[in-house]
C-alpha cells in the first residue's frame, strides 16, 4: 500500500456543512473510491485554521489518479465548491504532504 496525505482548506463558515456532506458520503462515490484501490481514507478538520488534513492508503498512483476522471468525482467536486476553495476544474485546492515519520 502507498500512504498519501494532503491538506485542503474549508471556508470558515462551512465547517458543519462540510462535515454534514461527508456523513455519509454518496454511496456511489464510496464505491468508486474503493474500486480504485483507496483504503482507510480519513479527513481531519483543524477548526482554528480552517484546514483539512486527509490520509489515504492506495493500491496504485494510476488507479488513485483515475478517480478524478470519473463522472461521480466530477459531480462531487462541483457539489463541494461552495464550502471550500476550488481549482478551475472544480477540484479542491490541495497540497500533498511529505511523510516524515511512520510507526507501523
Swiss-Prot record:
GO terms for molecular function: L-rhamnose mutarotase activity. GO terms for biological process: rhamnose catabolic process. It is an enzyme of class 5 (isomerase). Pathway: Carbohydrate metabolism; L-rhamnose metabolism. It catalyses: alpha-L-rhamnose = beta-L-rhamnose. Its EC number is 5.1.3.32. Substrate binds at residues 18, 41, 76-77. It comes from the Bacteria. It is found in: Cytoplasm. Disulfide bonds: none annotated. Its main location: cytoplasm. InterPro entries: Dimeric_a/b-barrel, L-rhamnose_mutarotase, Rham/fucose_mutarotase. GO terms for cellular component: cytoplasm. Keywords: Carbohydrate metabolism, Cytoplasm, Isomerase, Rhamnose metabolism. NCBIfam families: YiiL_rotase. Involved in the anomeric conversion of L-rhamnose. Belongs to the rhamnose mutarotase family. Homodimer. HAMAP family: L_rham_rotase. This is L-rhamnose mutarotase. It comes from Escherichia coli O157:H7.
Amino acid at each position: 500500500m502507498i500512504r498519501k496525505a494532503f491538506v485542503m482548506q474549508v471556508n470558515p463558515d462551512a465547517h458543519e456543512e462540510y462535515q454534514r456532506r461527508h456523513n455519509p458520503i454518496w454511496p456511489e462515490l464510496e464505491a468508486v473510491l474503493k474500486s480504485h484501490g483507496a483504503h482507510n481514507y480519513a479527513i481531519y478538520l483543524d477548526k482554528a485554521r480552517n484546514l483539512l488534513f486527509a490520509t489515504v492508503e492506495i493500491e496504485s498512483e494510476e488507479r488513485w489518479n483515475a478517480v478524478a476522471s470519473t463522472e461521480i468525482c466530477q459531480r462531487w467536486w462541483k457539489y463541494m465548491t461552495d464550502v471550500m476553495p476550488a481549482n478551475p476544474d472544480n477540484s479542491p485546492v490541495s497540497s500533498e504532504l511529505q511523510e516524515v515519520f511512520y510507526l507501523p
